């Protein structure tokens, strides 16, 4: 990918040069007749000495956070059997940069938010560090340091890293994301396309303060997260970086963007998303304490009702009024769903007071509760509505994950 990017940059340079030369040729042709007569009167062009105060709220905000935004470098084992095309289409997997025989697989961004003794803590996206064999963090001053993983949470796509604080100058501060306003300035700071563009800043506004965004994880499961929407330019490599307000406070951790419509027919601009700072602070505090996030689990494998064929749906004998829900594919022995009497073929339509039309709805409803809470689950069996009081005594770490269907 690095080679492809350089090629594009060079091509842009050539086109720009051609335009400049063309303009020069036109100017000369229109002034040629008087050139000889005016040579004695020509004067050289000079740079103006007038100074301009360029300090603004934006430049001040960027200055406050720039030293705390870093590049995160993910090294993985080199796959010698991979195609030569992987260097073009596989991110930085073809990079010559390596450490201890490992290959630089990808790069993202991160934010230093805390110093404690000889350590400093960095928050980034989980997908930035996924699959790593080794991690480096490139500081704003150019120093590259080793990083270790304190903890991560796939569901919220957040991770906490620990590095030496020796060269750390500043740490970022978090704003209260519950007080954000649509239309207020938003600035993204990170490393788009990798560390060669480290500490790139782009400016926009907050387009929305709360959006439900559906993410597809590497294992195929989908999750719903709450996100801030912005039109500040966010590109590959910005993941894990800072979205800041006009005071230089972090209001979100940049995470994703929409580039095309779902069917790929229309390109999209200005739809970037960040995890709100209040959610970030809640998760990183738990990751620092426990290294993981414990969430309640039902103990089922499931499939969305909408994904079943007409023939399969008819066998469930559902009333015509039931058009959405989650079909229990199997029940794991010893977990809450089994203890409450749920069986394969049941169709869950509600958890507590929250309607469930998909697996992401079920996850969102379930994860709003704590372990050992008791919730009422509404489901259909043989066409009849039933309820079960389910004690959420187990966590997601107790789940079997070998099935291709979603688990919870």
Curated annotation (Swiss-Prot):
Domain PDZ: 302-383
Bilayer topology annotation: Single-pass membrane protein
SUPFAM superfamilies: PDZ domain-like (SSF50156), Trypsin-like serine proteases (SSF50494)
Class in the EC hierarchy, top level: hydrolase
Observed phenotype of the null mutant: Inactivation leads to growth thermo-sensitivity and reduce the efficiency of secretion of the recombinant protein produced, although the protein produced is completely stabilized. Cells lacking this gene show an alteration of surface properties.
The entry's keywords: Cell membrane, Hydrolase, Membrane, Protease, Serine protease, Stress response, Transmembrane, Transmembrane helix
Gene Ontology molecular-function annotations: serine-type endopeptidase activity
Catalytic activity: Acts on substrates that are at least partially unfolded. The cleavage site P1 residue is normally between a pair of hydrophobic residues, such as Val-|-Val
List of residues binding substrate: 237-239, 298-302
UniProt KW Aminoacyl-tRNA synthetase keyword: no
GO cellular component term of the entry, any: plasma membrane
Inducers of expression: Induced during stress conditions.
An example Gene Ontology biological process: response to temperature stimulus
Family indicated by similarity: Belongs to the peptidase S1C family.
Record's function text: Degrades abnormal exported proteins and responsible for the propeptide processing of a natural pro-protein and for the maturation of a native protein. It also plays a prominent role in stress (heat shock, ethanol, puromycin and NaCl) resistance during active exponential growth.
Protein name: Serine protease Do-like HtrA
The species this protein was found in: Lactococcus lactis subsp. lactis (strain IL1403) (Streptococcus lactis)
Lineage, top ranks: Bacteria, Bacillati, Bacillota, Bacilli, Lactobacillales
Gene this protein is translated from: htrA
């Amino acid at each position: 990918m690095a080679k492809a990017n350089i090629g594009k940059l060079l091509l842009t340079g050539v086109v720009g040069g051609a335009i400049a030369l063309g303009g020069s040729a036109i100017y000369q042709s229109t002034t040629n007749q008087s050139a000889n007569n005016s040579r004695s009167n020509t004067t050289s062009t000079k740079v103006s000495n007038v100074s301009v105060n360029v300090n603004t709220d934006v430049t001040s905000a960027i200055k406050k956070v720039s030293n705390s935004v870093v590049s995160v470098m993910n090294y993985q084992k080199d796959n010698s059997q991979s195609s030569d095309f992987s260097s073009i289409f596989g991110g930085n997997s073809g990079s010559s940069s390596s450490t201890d025989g490992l290959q630089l697989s990808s790069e993202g961004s991160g934010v230093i938010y805390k110093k404690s003794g000889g350590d400093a803590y960095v928050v980034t996206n989980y997908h930035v560090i996924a699959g790593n064999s080794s991690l480096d963090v490139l500081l704003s001053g150019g120093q590259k340091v080793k990083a270790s993983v304190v903890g991560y949470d796939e569901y919220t796509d957040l991770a906490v890293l620990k590095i030496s604080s020796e060269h750390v100058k500043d740490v970022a501060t978090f704003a209260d994301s519950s007080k954000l306003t649509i239309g207020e300035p938003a600035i993204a700071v990170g490393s788009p396309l990798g560390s060669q563009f480290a500490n790139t800043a782009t400016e926009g506004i907050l387009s929305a303060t709360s959006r439900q965004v559906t993410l597809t994880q590497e294992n195929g499961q989908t999750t719903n997260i709450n996100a801030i929407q912005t039109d500040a330019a966010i590109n590959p490599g910005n993941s894990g970086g800072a979205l800041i307000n006009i005071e230089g406070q972090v209001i979100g951790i940049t995470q994703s963007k929409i580039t095309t419509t779902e069917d790929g027919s229309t390109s999209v601009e200005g739809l970037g998303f960040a995890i709100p700072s209040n959610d970030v602070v809640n998760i990183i505090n738990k990751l620092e304490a426990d290294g993981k996030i414990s969430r309640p689990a039902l103990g089922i494998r499931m499939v969305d009702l909408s994904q079943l064929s007409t023939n399969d749906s008819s066998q469930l004998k559902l009333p015509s009024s039931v058009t959405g829900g989650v079909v229990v594919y199997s029940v794991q022995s010893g977990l809450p769903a089994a203890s409450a009497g749920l069986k394969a073929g049941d169709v869950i339509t509600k958890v507590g007071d929250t309607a469930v039309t998909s697996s992401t709805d079920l996850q969102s409803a379930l994860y709003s509760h704590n372990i050992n809470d008791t919730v009422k689950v509404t489901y259909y069996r043989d066409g009849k509505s039933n309820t079960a009081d389910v004690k959420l005594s187990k966590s997601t770490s107790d789940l079997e994950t070998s099935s291709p269907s979603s688990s919870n």
